[in-house]
């Protein structure tokens, strides 16, 4: 296969100091890597994109191109830094990528929603079909228009997280008793203290889950109160940063009988306790507005809810040894997709298909065959 082609796409400006780069502020752009098939190809192009991860070297790009499907790994303006990430603005970036591919002459464009990109792809298509996200969660206008969001022809979701807001609600450490102190702990809810034998009792898990939601709701109430205070104070900034400590504490990491699949004990990122206490982790660095858009109960980017509002064909690739998506996750997607959804089980597949070249091949084969059936 030839090398990937670097793609730079102009996008609309975002909020003040969205990037510390003056060059980016003067000319906002996003970047991607396009892998094209040799020869004529199928006339179909795919975009694989995540709200913040760098997907320019995604493992599906070359296999899809080898099967006649051009594939662009596209980064949002927030690549590598989700501190100020607004999901509604990411839609503009993804829409710019779709428009760019259409302008290159591709007859059909599909989205590959991998990992956290699944909720993004679903959010995008739901808004492309019927624009409702006219305002951010905090109430300011998004300035999105239908012209920003050309619809795509199909969605392919793999190792699909249900959305940032759901994920954080299931991963927040409920033992935190002081939001300013990363070490302050209520041992009764410390998953990693070793106080409870595995498998965990059902009532223990229920109390843990309730405490997670209670912490999320406390943070959310503080965010709203702080935002209202700023907006009521002359000369105050429009937003502020804050930290959320310990965001990697799900009983399923330690008890594989919960929502059982083929996963090993632990986190997809290594030792779960280490990730929980790490200086940088999911949802650690935030602003008031970015928290509401990404992580809050009011986020507009809930994957299954958005998927239910779409009409295009959907392929769900379920990795059975994934330590971050579970049978209950797949059930949410299946219910949302209904009869439009086809599920392909990738037996033994871990979240990233790391070290599993045969399963990458299986996934690309399944995607090619499914697209040949549903796109006419």
Model-derived features with residue positions:
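Conserved alpha/beta-hydrolase "acid-adjacent" motif
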Residues: 58, 167, 299, 322-329
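Alpha/beta-hydrolase
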Residues: 188-305
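Catalytic histidine-centered segment of alpha/beta-hydrolase-like enzymes
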Residues: 349-361
